[in-house]
Amino acid sequence: MDTPRVLLWAIFLISFLWDLPGFQQASISSSSSTELDSTKDVENRKGGKMQRTPQESAEGRTPKEHRPRPNELRRRLPGQSLGQEPPGRGPRVVPHEYMLSIYRTYSIAEKLGINASFFQSSKSANTITSFVDRGLDDLSHTPLRRQKYLFDVSTLSDKEELVGAELRLYRQAPPTPWGPQTRPLHLQLFPCLSPLLLDSRTLDPQGPTEAGWEVFDVWQVLRPQPWKQLCLELRAVWGELDARDSGARPRGPQQSPPLDLRSLGFGRRVRPPQERALLVVFTRSQRKNLFTEMHEQLGSAEAAGAEGSWPAPSGAPDAGSWLPSPGRRRRRTALSSRHGKRHGKKSRLRCSRKPLHVNFKELGWDDWIIAPLEYEAYHCEGVCDFPLRSHLEPTNHAIIQTLMNSMDPGSTPPSCCVPTKLTPISILYIDAGNNVVYKQYEDMVVESCGCR
């Protein structure tokens, strides 16, 4: 075969192989990767985008907690530096371990499909509010015969059903033994300036004198009327109690004066925050929209501030930060339009449950929500076209509407892919009075989707 014919066959073979996709891809990948990267950089610059690695993105972005939010700038007072608490506001609330344990227990129960209101400890309540004792130490050196506990309960709403209330007092280990006493020791709780005995506890003087919590039922004093300030008084006496006496005083000739409560471990001095007296109120409220309820809390906080009560917490967000501003609406519209373009054929998938991760910190709610800071809410997405699947549990109306849409799409819109089953989650947050609240919010997680 002569040389011209060989060259002709070689040119023909190369041109044939070049048209094959695999050969062309191999040829491109064997070329310089630097040239390809530089081409991508040029294209990204033209589109106004710069590619960065995740590490570079994190380092190049100012941390969210260090950036002032618009509502935070509005709340700053003249001469107040960023991050400094306004005058009159206390330090950031530290949740009591009891409230944290309630949240942990009920959250685990919800994941197992058990409603938290079924627990006996919840008293069938969906809201549990804790109030920390605001009383001051008795600095005198005289025996402490009566220990008073003060609580600001002005944030309690008369629209909620009160189903229980208890006072939790931590009894520290006594510094000295009680002595060779054979009579029982009675702890009695009264409303301040009232002879009405609310509850009592009996301690065995011969038993172990270990530290622990004493729990008193105070539902009786909160039930008749909503209080703004609640004052409770603790006393301790030896001897048998006369059940016929409304004051439940000791009976018999061996009556002794009330004991020094400090010697029993009820003094306030050198007491860490987790051992302070705690008033826990159990209420049951009707189902509310999350935003509506928070608006009501802001309104009550502003009213309380006008009356000269304790100020609202620094963590309570402004109402404007919850509502969609025009800028947010435009941004959401732009995102939704990009979303539609990006999905293309994927948007034609049938109605089903899709992931939706909610991060309260990204929403700017981490300054008043304690836990959880994030959760999986899910959402419903997809089309409801004919024929509808049985697992979508369509209503009769949805079936007819889908059938009409399949016959004439221009006359009838298709049925919508919406949640058909929603479940609650537990949220631990700080209310307008700086109190730690556990609440079970309904309709927070999508469990199933259907066509409606």
Swiss-Prot record:
Residues 23-332 form a propeptide. SMART domains: TGFB. Keywords: Apoptosis, Cleavage on pair of basic residues, Cytokine, Developmental protein, Disulfide bond, Glycoprotein, Growth factor, Secreted, Signal. Disulfide bonds join C351-C417, C380-C449, C384-C451. It is found in: Secreted. Gene3D superfamilies: 2.60.120.970, Cystine-knot cytokines (2.10.90.10). This is Growth/differentiation factor 6. The gene is Gdf6.
